[in-house]
Amino acid sequence: MMLKWIYKFYLWDVYIMKIKQQKQIKGYLVREFGEEKGTELFSNEEKILNVLIKNTHNKTENQMNTLITTILPRIALYKTLLKADLSNEDVHNYMQNYMINEVAEKKHSSTAKMELVPFFYKIYSSVFLRVVRKSDLWVSEQNYGKDYFDVTMKKCLWHTACVENDCEELCSLFCDVDDITYGGLKKIGFKRTKTLGYGGDCCDFHFYKK
């Protein structure tokens, strides 16, 4: 049993090196802090990420994959900056800069390009609802009509991960990524009045056809 767990942890170590977002985080840290300091911070981030992964239990394969490739690297970055010689305000600013400029803007650009596809709204709404309905990343309710679709998320893996890793305050930045990603699109409108990350009892996504 012990050998099995050691091998599993070894595979995680190898997996971390191949996570695409890790390359993005390293590049960001080097640009912001310079080669020497940025590389040192990234090394610390990798160690923290490894610990976060090893301490994550009772998750499905799909949830674990999403945590490793998407959520935990950002939590590890946040915890790395908290341990650096930075003020809380600076830590927030660095994380906000990363989440908005490195993550959200690229997601928005990718979504905007998809709008060029004929019947984009019909396709996107159908896929979005199907994914949310079948995925174990959220606990949600869906409602839809001809020109709109709503998703009320009562639980989401992003918020859960932040709570479980003692950084619930970080979750609001994950929510901000959604606002940038879906804001200002030409064929789909997006509104939301509350989120789990900002202290609400749910995330009330409302999409509508423009």
Language-model segments: what does each one mean?
Residues 69-75, 79-165, 170:
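Amphipathic interaction/junction segments at domain boundaries or subunit interfaces
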Residues 4, 48-52, 56, 66, ...:
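Amphipathic, alpha-helical segments enriched in basic
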Residues 34-36, 87, 168, 188:
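Short coil/loop linkers at secondary-structure junctions
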Residues 2-81:
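N-terminal, charged low-complexity regulatory/assembly segments
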Residues 147-150, 155-210:
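C-terminal non-catalytic interaction appendages of large macromolecular assemblies
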Residues 66, 140, 194-196:
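Residues embedded in well-ordered secondary-structure elements
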Residues 29, 81, 128-132, 178-181, ...:
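Hydrophobic, Leu/Ile/Phe/Ala-enriched alpha-helical segments that form helix-helix packing faces
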